[in-house]
Amino acid sequence: MLDKYRSRLLLFLRKYGDQRLTHKALRWLRDLPLGREHLGTAIAVAVHNKQLVGIIAVGKYGVDEAIIAVKPTARNKGVAKQLVSFIVNRLGRMYARVAVDNTASLNLCFSMNMVAFDMFTGVTGKPTLWLGAGDWRREEIEGIINK
């Protein structure tokens, strides 16, 4: 099913990701193999009136990637919260990396009771927070933090 919609999902993310989604994250989704389940990996979409209004994609609970985008006309209506909630409920936990100047995403994460547990310099050179939701464990990403 992913192959049928992959190009549309990527186009949506490029268009509505407000230029905050990394090329690495988009390549991850583009290259995500089909045919078998990947532990901690899920994609969910939000649809309103038969129109795609939001996407979330998480790889390895967010340790590999966690990307979300919502169409501007659907923002501040709970779409992003529903998508994050779906992923946390389905996977049991979720991690995200958010640059400290991305106030919209930080507001979303903190409104979902995500916990900031580490800060590092992200790929854009900006201070970036690691956040966890649900049954998150710092040890799960310890090797990444200490690199």
Language model features with spans:
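Extended, folded domain segments that form the structural surfaces/walls around functional sites
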Residues: 67-68, 96
